Amino acid sequence: MEAPQQSAISEELEELLAHDLSEPAAALPEVPRYPAPKHRKRDSTEPPDWKVSFAQSVLLRTFCENVGNILTECYFEVVRSEDPDGFSGLSVESIDQGRVCLVQARLSGQVTLGPGAPAGPRGFCVRMSNLTSSLKSGHACHFVDLWQPAGSSDVVFRIYEPNVSNYAPEFTLRTLAKGNDCQGLNGLEYNLFVEIDLETFRGAVRMAKDHKADVLTLAVYAPKKKGPPGSPDVSFFVISYDADEVSSKFPYQSSTESEAHVDGKPTVIRANDTSSTGYDCLPPEEELDTVFSDRFGVEHLFHFVRGMERRELTLRLDQGKPLLLEYPMGGSSRADYIRFVLAPKIQ
């Protein structure tokens, strides 16, 4: 049988997805967003064109590793907001070489502009393997300064420990002559939110990869026979795949009170729901209505989830639209996240 082809994210969709889709991360202990002035290392050279400082090297490392799982080369935009409540730091919006997966991400940092800083967008493109391997020399308590020397195309970053005057590792990365290759997606709305335990979803994806399946089918079903007014609405979220020698199905049940449904609001399906739905197993197909069903590449899904650490994951689904999966970064800023947008497989 001929292998399914992977659809690219269309130009129409590239004009759709807005940043307001991100949901607040869970409350976390307050930690510094970037080094205090007394902790920063002094540069011995003239002021750089721009500089970004981070107080937690572990966050920057996690950020880069998750982006690097998908992108071999990445363009980072340096963003500085004049609004104290606005976003300043590193922003990513790039599509992979196969033009199948879009990565949107941002990480807060303190941005300083030098007198020679260029007007308009500022950024750099580097090979991700060089960046992530260099960041491994830092520990969780270390700070990171990242800057572009005046008049240079290189990017330099230094990893150091606060209040310690000993030698700090410094790396100079050659940048690639490549700009931002994506216009992004704006205004895309989703009708289905599926909340599922990260280890549960990652286990199904890993099993599909181990069995050499190319695609994973994500589906949402609802019983054709509805309960009496006021009774819970039952949904079934099913992960399945068909490999050459193994086929598998992972069904999950969810119960949502009918009164909770509001027109214009997405339906939230909690695959981790342990409340009784009245069903011992997934009913036969003839007793179910298909709410959503689409297929996505196992390889991309595996790279998405392998570096994640949060306990729960939210999948945004809608027929004919790409899968949207968002990973809040934590830290002191709730605006920091990595978002993966994956086009479905063509049948």
Show the residue positions of the predicted features.
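DNA polymerase sliding clamps and clamp-related checkpoint/processivity subunits
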Residues: 1-211, 217-347
